[in-house]
């Protein structure tokens, strides 16, 4: 089968990482996969994919609404003649139109967040609803909670759930849960409102002086980074918070950390949590979106609200108990098998085959 994936571009983010993982896994299953990036920007992820032999076609999209993308995509679809078009994020606006113009190619759209957030406004929500109800695109939810929001928001009866997956072989499982002279807390994510960096910094600042040997490593970049660097200094923790930027390979940072924190305001199914699980890291995460479908509260992770005091208390529990760190980490490692890239790819293939059989 030939699958054509369409994505805005390969910045560092969960949807982009999922698209990369799915592309490799589909190819390993014997499928022909081509990727279209709307923007011309090359990144470490796109470079890595091209080095691995993945063909990426770039459209040089202009910022904002650019309807010239539709005929460009239509031309590519006619040239490539895919069996299925798989869209991510807001490319659904252009790609489904192009798929219809190119002969009615079946489309699958991964909903990477709760429905209202993922739609990015009323106009996009109306268009998505039209596409879904006409059967021009089939939404796939990342978790039961995301599925619930999609069925309610769009008034749909059938929304399949396919968990995100990662290449678990790239994870480096922890062997020891003892603490060194410095206790390393890790967060990975874009600096935007969703990831709640301000709340995370407040939680870290609340750790008592008995835990003054802690450091907080923040991987990622984004429009709020400079503001958060300033905020860390204002909270008096600038010396202990390390802003490390985007990293092409996060696995060594996960392996070297003592715990992973993700107190987001909302989520779909965070790839970073799967990678932390595959490393056997004890995890503190907010009880939002698909996170409770991934972590068993108190057994494979500590689930909290977004309140800094609650997040801080969970961190203290982990710092104070090697037994708890080991139990949560090992249970998370065992549970990570549910989220392999191969399993994800096989489930998507089932959906592709269902759609192509109906055509």
Segment roles from a protein language model:
Residues 5-67, 161, 223:
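N-terminal strand-loop element at the rim of the active site
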Residues 64-68, 148-153, 163-181:
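Acidic anion/phosphate-binding donor-loop and adjacent secondary structure
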Residues 282-285, 295:
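Short hydrophobic beta-strand element within catalytic cores of glycosyltransferases
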Residues 310, 317, 324-338, 347-350:
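A short, well-ordered alpha-helix in the C-terminal region of glycosyltransferases
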Residues 246, 265:
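Aromatic "clamp/platform" in nucleotide-sugar-dependent glycosyltransferases that forms part
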Residues 87-94, 111:
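Short His-centered aromatic/hydrophobic patch
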Residues 13-24, 183, 187-206, 223-229:
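A conserved mid-protein helix/loop that constitutes part of the nucleotide-sugar donor-binding site
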Residues 297-298, 302-309, 317-322:
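Conserved acidic donor-binding segment of nucleotide-sugar-dependent glycosyltransferases
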């Amino acid at each position: 089968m030939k699958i054509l994936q369409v994505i805005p571009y390969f910045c560092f983010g969960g949807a982009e990482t999922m698209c990369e993982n799915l592309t490799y896994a589909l190819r390993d299953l014997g499928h022909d996969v081509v990727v279209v990036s709307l923007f011309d920007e090359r990144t470490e992820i796109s470079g890595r994919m091209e080095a691995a032999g993945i063909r990426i076609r770039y459209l040089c999209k202009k910022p904002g609404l650019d309807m010239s993308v539709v005929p460009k995509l239509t031309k590519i679809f006619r040239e490539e003649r895919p069996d299925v078009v798989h869209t991510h994020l807001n490319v659904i606006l252009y790609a489904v139109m192009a798929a219809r113009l190119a002969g009615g190619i079946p489309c699958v759209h991964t909903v990477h967040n709760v429905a209202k957030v993922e739609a990015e406004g009323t106009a996009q929500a109306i268009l998505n609803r039209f596409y879904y109800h006409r059967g021009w695109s089939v939404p796939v939810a990342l978790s039961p909670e995301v599925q619930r929001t999609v069925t309610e928001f769009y008034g749909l009866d059938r929304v399949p759930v396919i968990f995100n997956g990662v290449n678990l072989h790239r994870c480096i499982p922890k062997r020891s849960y003892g603490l060194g002279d410095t206790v390393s807390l890790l967060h990975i994510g874009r600096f935007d409102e969703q990831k709640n960096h301000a709340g995370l910094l407040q939680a870290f600042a609340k750790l008592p002086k008995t835990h003054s040997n802690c450091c907080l490593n923040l991987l990622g970049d984004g429009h709020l980074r400079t503001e958060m660097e300033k905020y860390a200094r204002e909270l008096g923790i600038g010396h202990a918070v390390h802003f490390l930027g985007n990293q092409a390979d996060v696995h060594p940072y996960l392996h070297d950390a003592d715990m992973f924190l993700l107190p987001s305001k909302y989520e779909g199914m965070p790839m970073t949590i799967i990678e932390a699980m595959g490393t056997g890291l004890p995890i503190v995460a907010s009880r939002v979106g698909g996170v409770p479908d991934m972590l068993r509260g108190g057994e494979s992770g500590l689930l909290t609200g977004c309140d800094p005091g609650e997040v801080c208390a969970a961190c203290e529990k982990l710092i104070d108990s090697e037994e708890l760190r080991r139990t949560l980490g090992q249970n998370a490692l065992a549970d990570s098998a549910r989220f392999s890239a191969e399993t994800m790819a096989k489930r998507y293939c089932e959906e592709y085959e269902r759609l192509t059989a109906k055509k």
